[in-house]
């Protein structure tokens, strides 16, 4: 901490993470973005020097803990917070990154930190049928390397998926994971700020995670809703009874400020002496007895390359995400025996499904123009509106909080949407001068609509490059290798073109950008063959990776964990993140990740004799037993 006192009645820390100027592109942005960051860091609710969990940070861990949680991201922050509610349990949270930077708290900056030092910046192996226009045909996968994980980088959209997603999990041999079983755990975390609008049947107040709409939306957002209505869709809460339609989504934010899992769950736990947090420390291996298969502890490496072993009394929880959870299991000798032998990792337990079943939502960036000058949404006027009132364009994500879900002709039923629409535009993220009306180009303003496949059939895998734990994993996404994914995506493109031709959007002069995609010149523009070519050239992976530590019964050869999230064949090890999803939920995955963590922590508490609450679907965890 620095020696300078702040108006927040406690010491202001040294700046954490990348600066806003650096995330915008460097020197041309230095003056305005640098000044803006100074103003932002003077705001107590943004910098939050008194509320950060820094009192829990440890440079030296203890010798032994009751529970060790690997990964302080979307799920791991929740697990560590919930376990530390039991004062008799000593809990260690291990995070490879540092604390979240202040700039990431601002909703309009949500894309700025992708590609920065708090991003793992993963790339897939060369893809045979997707990302063909990218360098070496590799798809880019941003993943948060920071306390809070990808919940520091994501678009904050709170989408749970469809009822049928979870009913299918249960039907596949995972009792306790049907929709009515998991709804209480969605509600447990939720502090819904719009309860009068969305109702109490599916939502709740009083949880640690604020969920509500941004203070401001551009007028175009409401025009998009009217466009959806013109095509016969209703506007309503897609997290309620009906998951088909349009909405301005609720977000994990309060008063125009992002709430990552770290901010929502760890900062309220900052006074608990039984919670320790190791930052800038990578878990390199889970220590497992080769004969008894009991977990003994965790091996870690700090930012200076020093390694140590930390022992565990009860259990290790792996919450490193759909990329790093299987990676750590493989490094620990848990995985397909033949693949481990190829990289000289000693097999502790042959578990063929580790790293398999990897899948992700996939999209295509459809570009449109509207009759509006291409000026920077960020300027001193919008900055002051945010700094003084937490309102205006910086308090939201432009039109990116609008979304829609619909069923194409390839959907299992009309009530089960297989396509989600995302929107992009009016994002107040970067500016050079701060002047009102600063031109970005001489063109009309661009608007993007992204149709995303919700039920992808294509499957990839995570593997090891070597036995070196600090070498990135091998990621094979296999996007668009199943033809139905391509067909569904093309249906989505044709729908968004229809949407752009509705009366509400025609009033903005919305028109399709007809620039021919390089590599698709041989096809007639707008034909199905053209769009099939285009989606393979300019593939847009979402950041919703899942499935690589699949939950399933022991007779499923590809299952990694059971319905209690215990790793098959290993004692004292569970996985709690989106990697356990048998099939990815139909929508953004942050809300389901938090739900998985809430349910997982409940299962741990129940297994180890802590007082827990009876669960039912009416809400919720209401009686101590």
From Swiss-Prot:
EC nos: 1.1.5.9
SUPFAM superfamilies: FAD-linked reductases, C-terminal domain, FAD/NAD(P)-binding domain
Keywords associated with the record: FAD, Flavoprotein, Oxidoreductase, Secreted, Selenocysteine, Signal
Cofactor(s) the protein requires to work: FAD
An annotated GO BP: glucose metabolic process
PROSITE patterns the UniProt entry points to: GMC_OXRED_1, GMC_OXRED_2
Record's catalysed reaction(s): a quinone + D-glucose = D-glucono-1,5-lactone + a quinol
Enzymatic class: oxidoreductase
Active site per UniProt: 544
Top-level division of the source organism's lineage: Eukaryota
GO CC, any one term: extracellular region
Binding locations of FAD: 66-95
Gene3D superfamilies, A to Z: FAD/NAD(P)-binding domain, Glucose Oxidase, domain 3
Signal peptide positions (record): 1-42
A GO MF term: glucose dehydrogenase (FAD, quinone) activity
Subcellular location(s) per record: Secreted
Primary location recorded for the protein, binned into one broad class: secreted
Function: Essential for cuticular modification during development.
Similarity remark: Belongs to the GMC oxidoreductase family.
Name the UniProt record assigns to this protein: Glucose dehydrogenase [FAD, quinone]
Originating species: Drosophila melanogaster (Fruit fly)
């Amino acid at each position: 901490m620095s020696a300078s006192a702040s108006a927040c009645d406690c010491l202001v820390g040294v700046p954490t993470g990348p600066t806003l100027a650096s995330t915008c592109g460097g020197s041309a942005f230095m003056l305005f973005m640098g000044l803006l960051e100074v103003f932002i860091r003077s705001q107590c609710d943004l910098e939050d020097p008194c509320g950060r969990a820094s009192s829990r940070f440890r440079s030296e861990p203890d010798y032994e803990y009751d529970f060790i949680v690997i990964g302080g991201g979307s799920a791991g922050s929740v697990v560590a917070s919930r376990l530390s509610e039991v004062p008799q349990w000593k809990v260690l949270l291990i995070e490879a990154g540092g604390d979240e930077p202040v700039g990431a708290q601002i909703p309009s900056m949500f894309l700025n930190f992708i590609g920065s030092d708090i991003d793992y910046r993963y790339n897939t192996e060369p893809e045979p049928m997707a990302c063909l226009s990218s360098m070496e045909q590799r798809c880019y996968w941003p993943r948060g390397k920071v306390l809070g994980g990808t919940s520091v980088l994501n678009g904050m959209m709170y989408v749970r998926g469809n009822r049928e997603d979870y009913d299918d999990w249960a039907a596949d041999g995972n009792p306790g994971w049907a929709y009515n079983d998991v709804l209480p755990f969605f509600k447990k975390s939720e502090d819904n700020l719009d309860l009068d609008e969305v109702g109490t049947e599916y939502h709740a107040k009083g949880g640690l995670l604020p969920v509500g709409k941004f203070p401001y939306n551009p007028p175009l957002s409401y025009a998009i809703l009217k466009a959806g209505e013109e095509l016969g869709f209703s506007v309503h809460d897609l997290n309620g009874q009906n998951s088909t339609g349009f909405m301005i989504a609720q977000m994990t934010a309060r008063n125009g400020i992002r709430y990552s899992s770290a901010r929502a769950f760890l900062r309220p736990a900052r006074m608990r002496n039984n919670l320790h947090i190791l930052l800038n420390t990578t878990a390199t291996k889970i220590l497992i007895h080769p004969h008894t298969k009991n977990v003994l502890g965790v091996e870690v490496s700090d930012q200076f390359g020093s390694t140590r072993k930390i022992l565990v009394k009860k259990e290790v929880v792996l919450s490193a995400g759909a990329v790093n959870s299987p990676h750590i299991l493989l490094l620990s000798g848990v995985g397909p025996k033949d693949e481990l032998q190829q990289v000289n990792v000693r097999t502790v337990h042959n578990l063929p499904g580790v790293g398999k079943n990897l899948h992700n939502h996939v999209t295509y960036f459809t570009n449109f123009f509207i009759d509006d000058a291409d000026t920077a949404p960020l300027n001193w006027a919008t900055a002051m509106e945010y700094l003084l009132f937490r309102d205006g364009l910086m308090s939201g994500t432009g039109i990116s909080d609008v979304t829609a879900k619909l069923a194409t002709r390839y959907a299992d039923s009309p009530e089960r949407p297989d396509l989600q629409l995302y929107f992009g535009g009016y994002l107040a993220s970067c500016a050079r001068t701060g002047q009102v009306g600063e031109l970005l180009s001489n063109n009309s303003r661009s608007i993007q609509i992204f149709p995303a496949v919700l039920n992808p059939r294509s499957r990839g895998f995570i593997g090891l490059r070597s036995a070196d734990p600090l070498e990135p994993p091998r990621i094979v996404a296999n996007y668009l290798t199943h033809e139905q994914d391509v067909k569904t995506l093309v249906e989505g493109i044709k729908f968004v073109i229809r949407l752009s031709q509705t009366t509400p959007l025609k009033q903005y002069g919305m028109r399709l950008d007809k620039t021919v995609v390089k590599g698709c010149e041989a096809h007639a523009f707008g034909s199905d063959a053209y769009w099939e070519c285009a989606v393979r050239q300019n593939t847009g992976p979402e950041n919703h990776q899942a499935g690589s530590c699949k939950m399933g019964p022991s007779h499923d050869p590809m299952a990694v964990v059971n319905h209690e999230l215990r790793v098959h064949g290993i004692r004292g090890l569970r996985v709690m993140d989106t990697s356990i999803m048998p099939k990815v939920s139909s929508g953004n995955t942050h809300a389901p990740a938090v739900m998985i963590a809430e349910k997982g922590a409940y299962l741990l508490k129940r297994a180890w004799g802590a007082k827990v609450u009876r669960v039912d679907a009416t809400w919720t965890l209401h009686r101590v037993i």
